[in-house]
Amino acid sequence: MDGVSSLPNELLCHILSFLTTKEAALTSILSKRWRNLIAFVPNLYIDDTVFLHPEEGKRDRPEIIQSFMDFVDRILALQGNYPIKKCSLKCLTEVDSVRVDAWISNVLARGVTDLDLLIILDCESDDNYRLSPKCLQSSTLVSLKIDGGIDIARVDNFDILLLALPALEELALVDVIWKDEDDYPLVNMKNLFDARIIFMLQLPGAREPDDDHWFDQNVALRYSNVWKLFLGLQNVPNLYLSPDTLKVLSLYCESMPVFKNLKSLAIKSGKERGWQAIPVLLRNCPHLETLVIEGVLHNVTDKCGDACDCISREDKGRSLTSCPVKMLEIRGFRGTMKEMTMMKHFLDYFLCLKAMNIYVEENDPTELRFPEVSKCIMQMMEEYNKLSSCNVELLVTDYFYFSEKWTAKGRIL
């Protein structure tokens, strides 16, 4: 008997839970001992791209698709009412939507806590999978991801959907079809732990002008009710905002809610987007502890606000001085003097700051590849640490001139 087969069933099922459901099912041919273990695997990874033959055209044959659906039916029937923790369902072929409904209902009835759906019935048409509200009624579901053009237009009230999921903490909606794409739901997502808000806007030119008129009337109208979405997120402890999301927020700063429970805020900046929304955002986070900024370089406008050092103003840094943030992470650092000026600005005006971690850009070349620049940056960091009680650290990887972690106090960690 080999060492693996001598393991207890519970441990074998745990090992199988890391495989795709097809791979786990194939182990049944090893011996009688393995034949029914698939019935007790707590995780399901059902992916028709893994099950179906990858050869061109073969996967679209009706008999192949039918065999995939029959396989899923057999697995679910074999498992019966055995509890399930996680289910990932990926269907990119013309499977029967009625059977998809049944599969989703099956795992929900068995107490699934993590559900990931990617369903595209027909890639060449607008025939989207229509998610029935009856398929999303669960007292155990904690994490839900809906992806791939799934139509939730039949869900008349989004708040009703969330009320049917009282334990939900993580919700991701990617490329879904809404009943009214110009409106946003006003719901209280009080259990939500982590929110990532990513809007995608189309600029009329390469860069935005210095005023807000670059939005045409139709686009502005589309986001006129966005405040309702953020009002429902005001209790979230962790929030991530994309560059376009910051731009949308800048149009409706007066409606921005107070995020009274927010502890960690992550912002991705962009050279084509300004920082108009950041001052109000920081003032509306009274208990913020960690701030992450990915890319401090941004588009400078006359309404950039007092959060940056781009334009001289009397109220410079006012929103920073009132912010209680203790940890600041800067990501995507390129080693430019403009970035270093921003670091000094943060050190001067974030009065509660205890630590600043600066992560060097890893995907593109930076100025740090030049020895004279890296030496200058180290000297400036050294000076910053002398002038501030905040501990400034530069974290880099795969750079010849730096160790894995260097502190401005001159220590190699």
From Swiss-Prot:
| SMART domains the UniProt entry points to | FBD, FBOX
Listed SUPFAM superfamilies: F-box domain
User: Which protein, by its recorded name, is this?
Assistant: Putative F-box protein At3g58820
Residues of the F-box domain: 1-48
User: Superkingdom, according to UniProt?
Assistant: Eukaryota
